Every structure is written in C-alpha cells, then in structure tokens.
Amino acid sequence: MMRSELENYLLQALNMALQISGESSYTNSFGVKVVDEGFFFIPRLPASYIIDDALYQKIYLICNAALYPTYSLIKQTGAYFVPLDTDDIHVKRALFFPWSKGIAKRLIIQDVENFASKLDGTEIPIMENLTINYDKTTGILIAGNSGAGKSYFLTYLLTVLSHISDLVIVDPKFDVPSRWGRDNDVEVIAPNESRSKSDFVSAVNNELSKCLELIHKRQQILYNDCNAHFNHYTVVIDEVLALSEGVTKSIKEAFYSLLVQVSLLGRSTKLHLLLVSQRFDSNAIPISCREQMNVLVQVGNINTKTTQFLFPDLDLKGIVIPQGKGTGLIQIIDSEHPFQVVPLLTPTYYIKGE
C-alpha cells in the first residue's frame, strides 16, 4: 500500500470512529501524514476539540486495530507531541504515533544448542524482530503465573547465556534449572534435605557476597584501565519469592541488601542478575533492585493485577496480546529499543535427541 493510500485509509477510519464535536477531515479539521517510523495526526487549530491524552488514546485505539497486522502501533504512556517544520501557526504541531512493521512473531528453533553456539557477539534473539544486547543489560526479570512458560523460557535463556556468560544457578525448587545445570556443568545452589531453609539462603547470600567482591575487583581494574574487558557473569535465581519467605529477619535483610548492591553496581563490571518469580512485589525483591532491571518480562495471564509490579503505569487498552503458552509482554530499556512495552511470544525450541 502506497503512503497516499495509507493516509486516506487512516483518515477514513478516523472520520468514521473519532467523533470529535462533529469535526472531520471533510471540514479540514485535521490531517494525517505517514512516514517510515509511524504517522502524524495534524490538528488544524483553533479547533472545537481538546488535544490531550484522551484524544491521543482514542486515536491509538482506532488506528491500532485498523493497521493490524501490517503495522503495530507502539503504546505510549501519554500524548506524543512533535513540532512540525512550517511557519503556519495553525499546523505547527502534531500527535505522533510510532509503529513497528508487522506483528510479534515467535522464533521456531529446531536445535537450540546448535542455534545458540552459532550466535554472534552478545545478541540474544527473543522474537523474529527483537533481540537483546547483553552488553547493555543490567538484569532480567521474568514474572508469570504457574504454568505460564517461565521455566521453558528460562531454559532457553540459560542455553544462550552459557555461550556468552559465566553462570551460577540458584534453584529453590530443585527442578528444571537444576537439571539443566547438571547436564551443562554449571554450578547450582539448591536445597538439601539435611540443611535448613536459613542455611540454604545463607549459601545464596555467600554467593552474592562473592559477586560483590568480584564487582569491587573489576571496578578497581576499570579505575586503572577504562578499556578493560571482562567476561559476563550472571547469577540466575528461580522462584526468588521462595527465598525471602520463612527465613530469619537478619538473613532476609542480608539477602535484600546484597541483591540491591549487585543490581546497582553490576552493570559496568558485566555482572548481571536473572530473576524469576510469580510476581515481583516488595516481598520478592526490594523496589530499588526491581527498578535497576532493564529487561522486564511478564508471561501468562495479562491484566492490570498481574502487570502492576513490572509495568505499574501501563494502560492495556488497545495492546494486542498474543494468546497461548509463553506469551505476554516485554520491555527492554536501553539505547537500542523504544522504552514502550510490546507483545511477546517466547521462542519455541527443540533439543537434539529429544
């Protein structure tokens, strides 16, 4: 579809559904301009309608459905005003609606180990049109209800990360991550029937303390040589909420303190946290730790209740969320991606010999 055809199509959709005080493009009240990155809604002022967040969201709802599946509008938290290069004061501003071409598409991987071994650099493919640059990642949070596909997605990430990072796995459930660690010669900290819960969490604290020592050593090296290169080091904790429940206050506070310090100081020294939990409220991890993580994933049932901790300001209206296992939302906060939350389809993969 040519740009002019797309502009006319969007104008027709807005004329029929927007209903703003009887104003339309037929009365020359607004126009639409399409560019590669999205489209502009250009109001001609003065006008009898108010240009605010409510109008922006209404246009978003209309056009996101009209453009699907050719384009996916990127959800904004508020009205996105941009100036236009013109001397005409009546049309010097516009509302901008950025988009991405197509819709979220799931990766299908026939041999995940072979796939991971052939990846270049530190890029982690998530979907066909979405990758994570691990060099720019501070930490990853994966939340979701039981049976939503958290462990399946975690196993994929572990397989990819094993080629670009040193790993330590903490597995309170002694389940899938422990078996993966055993099969891939990765250190696993897991409960033992002869140890108490507090003793197990103390062992986790000891590992986090070692991470903090490593951070300090690398900081000293960076102080003397700002171009020093380090291997990535990742601490993976499954069901993190299980660690903070049922332990003494002193051990719990030490666990929280170490998590915060590692998350705050780890990025420049390439030390990362990968945390998995059914939810990330303040009982799971401290708020300051949660706010440091820049890859946020919510899988499974998506509603305002399940997204309130990872995406507290997100308005779900208009977002086309895929259905099925391993689906949800993802937000990557770095210099390479828009900060907005986008739909997610986690990879489907197969293991050779299974």
Feature map (PLM): residue ranges:
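Conserved ATP-driven motor cores of ASCE-family P-loop NTPases powering translocation/secretion/packaging/pilus
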Residues: 58-61, 277-353
